[in-house]
Amino acid sequence: MTLLTSSLLLFSLLTSRLEAIPVLEKSPAHPAHSAHPAHPSHPSPGVRILRAPESLVAPLGDEVVLECETSLQPERFEWSHRSSRSQGAGFKYLRTGTAKANVSQEAAISRLRVLVREDTLGEYRCVGWFGPLVVTSTIARLELASTSLVGAQESESPLQWRVAAGNSVLWSCGQQVQSNPSASWSYYRNGVEIKPEFIGTNGNLILSNVSSESSGSYSCQATNPASGERIQLPGLLQLQVTPEQRSLSKSPHLLKGQPSSQEITIREGSSLLLLCPGVGSPPPTVVWSSPDVVGAVKNKRSKVFGHALEISDTRVQDAGTYICFQDNGVRPALEHYIKVHVEQPPQIVRPPWADLTNEGDRLKLECEATGVPSPEIYWLLNGHSSIDDTEAELSNNFLILHSVLKRHAGYVQCFARNRLGEHSAGTLLQVNPKQIQEPRESGGTHRPKPNQGSKQKQMYPPSPPNVTRLSDESVMLRWMVPRNDGLPIVIFKVQYRMVGKRKNWQTTNDNIPYGKPKWNSELGKSFTASVTDLKPQHTYRFRILAVYSNNDNKESNTSAKFYLQPGAALDPMPVPELLEIEEYSETAVVLHWSLASDADEHLITGYYAYYRPSSSAGEYFKATIEGAHARSFKIAPLETATMYEFKLQSFSAVSASEFSALKQGRTQRPKTSTTEEPTLQMGDRDTTTPSHNETFNMSPMLTGTLGGGAVLTLLLISICLCVCRRRSSRSRGNNPNKPRMAELRDDFVPLGNCSPTKQRQRTRHIHITLNPLAQQQQGMEEKNDTDQDAPYYQRPSSYDYDPGLRRMSSSSLRRSQRTLERAGGSNGSNNGNNNNLNQSTETGPVENPGKPGRVLMKRPRLSSRSENLSSGSLNSVGV
């Protein structure tokens, strides 16, 4: 059955239409359907400022609190200050616990309490220390609350306006007030406060559709919301409203003191209110338009209220000139122009990015930002200004380090700044230090030995590991061995210790093999390993121990201090979704995945890929994928034509995400070539995978014919072998002169022939005991057994004289004879128990003229072949 099934499968395979599978040269970097920026995702240290201190305006003598929060609890917080009285001075770290500044810390939140004085005004920064990493917040300004009049005369005479009923009157009473923060306004008519129709007019009072009841004396008052200071403006408005019927026709015109044009500056995201001054008789109709802004009036964010145009959620594209056109049928019409400027806080759109950099190399970092006015770009290296660094050069939006030094390793931050605020972005700069040759112990010149090379290979240590939290009790380490020509590394060991006094280094039990001596990137070869059984809410350091081919070892530099944060206190990381497992080759697959939102990429440093054969329940193999923009990755080497299961998780230095759903995929099946590949004479060529022209170049019809003929030939040969073996077995069984020993052995040989399954047969020890006295009964048993021989696998018994019996000792013959005589003397019958066959035997006297008095024991016949197989000791005959 097995042979037939295999033959049919081979026949179907050979007769199917086979085409060569093209060989892929390189794994695609990204799926085709996704868009990617010009540079990979910037490596993030995993720690960042979640909440920077905010700018405040307060009066003298008041106490303010500045708050700063980081994503992970730092080792310590510090605050720096730059006074507003010293122009051009740098930031200085504050001494805490003084009368004018006090710092308190609660987990990952730091609070700075400042007493507002002339010397405490200025700019403040929050600085978080995470081992060698320094993360700096954006600037918070502390300013003094103030309100003042600009160019106003206390003896200013009031305005006298006379208008026809039905007009809209605009009075700008707040043009002479300067307030920080912006003042709130109150309006009065005849000494009684009135509620304005529009709020947020910045000191402009608009009276729509005035009537005789609107006549009166108007005044206004400005209040500073921070200090509560109030200023009563000296200017007054005397308004007189006449009935429309009594007014003469007059074209639209401006009243005394009304501006002919306006220029307004507003912050992006605020609400903008444009007011159109002018009156006429009859009251004019107002039409709004803009030659610079398409759809400025007819959109969901704009509303027209006669002489007012309100634009909510102002955007940069709303900047431009707006025209208020007034017409009442009397020429000329009136046009009023309003110039709108929209300011935008700075926003970094292209953050800096840095990879592992060798010490002494040149590094160029770019930082691109938007904002109105155009923001100023400056850089901090681990909290220190790049201006003070002798190796740094600033060129437009670029930071150039002519020679990267060890002190540059850490966090590099780019800041974009304009008068509306600041925005920052950073990257982790890892510096691969130069390898320093160890000096020889003995001084003077060293003459090499005859058998010793002129240059001895060095032991290059691995880089210090980067640490990522996996769970409350485990972390993942990532390190790299830089490209070198030193001694090969055999295995790695991971060591860790808890930070504190008298804490020793612990070594994990796992040996991490180096693998093939092959660099998997331009910088070197990267590795990963996990460390378990750690304690949460404790700080650890890690290092890597490399064991070399000379059985010596060398340690890496220790990692930065890592605080193992409990998972409940961390925000969840975005979980990638495995989309497809592409069969890349016989030994490789390509994973394709996606994120729920590309906006989450700034939270991710890279991905961990886990895989193992689907038939295995062992531990997963791990692979590290650097860069948040990656959407595919090739995993190799794998077993040929093997099903694997895969899962992914994203990670940062703080934590790792939950695992994605398991997805299975297999490697390609082996490609069988029907042509022999010629031997290469010159050059290097990859012969592991046949090319398109070399694979299956025979036609499908010819291939099918040859395959079918081969299968039929195999079937005929198998049938002939089985028939011949069965005939030879029968011919041997019919030979009456065959020795008894050979007959018993042949009885059980056919059990292994023509077996339907190739199961492993259990080896049994054969114990055969011949009855030397049973030969005289040969004729009688042949007569009784001949008719029933076919249904049984046991051959007919033959007791012919065998010359081999002469070799049996006379003592054994006499013992056997006495046993039979005793059995025959017990009333001529006895039911003996055969322990091997578990069947009864019959004994009795048999008359034999040649040998009187001889008692023979008749051997029982087995009922079936299956009973023979289940006996367990078929080749033992009890006498």
Curated annotation (Swiss-Prot):
UniProt binding sites for heparin: R497, K501, K503, R541
Signal sequence residues: 1-20
Domain Fibronectin type-III as annotated: residue spans: 461-567, 575-670
Keyword Repressor found: no
Stretches with biased composition (Low complexity): 822-836, 863-879
GO molecular function, a single term: coreceptor activity
Chain segments carrying region Disordered: 426-467, 662-698, 728-879
Disulfide-linked positions: C68-C126, C173-C220, C276-C324, C367-C414
Domain Ig-like C2-type: 45-142, 132-232, 252-340, 346-432
Pfam families, per database record: fn3, Ig_2, Ig_3
Glycosylation sites: N102, N209, N466, N557, N693
Keywords from the named record: Disulfide bond, Glycoprotein, Heparin-binding, Immunoglobulin domain, Membrane, Proteoglycan, Repeat, Signal, Transmembrane, Transmembrane helix
Transmembrane segments: 704-724
Topology with respect to the bilayer: Single-pass type I membrane protein
Extracellular side: 21-703
Main function: Mediates response to the active Hedgehog (Hh) protein signal in embryos, functioning upstream or at the level of patched (ptc).
Family: Belongs to the immunoglobulin superfamily. IHOG family.
Subunit structure, as described in the record: Homodimer. Heterotetramer; 2 iHog chains bind 2 hh chains when facilitated by heparin, heparin is required to promote high-affinity interactions between hh and iHog.
Protein name (Swiss-Prot/TrEMBL): Interference hedgehog
Originating species: Drosophila erecta
Gene designation: iHog
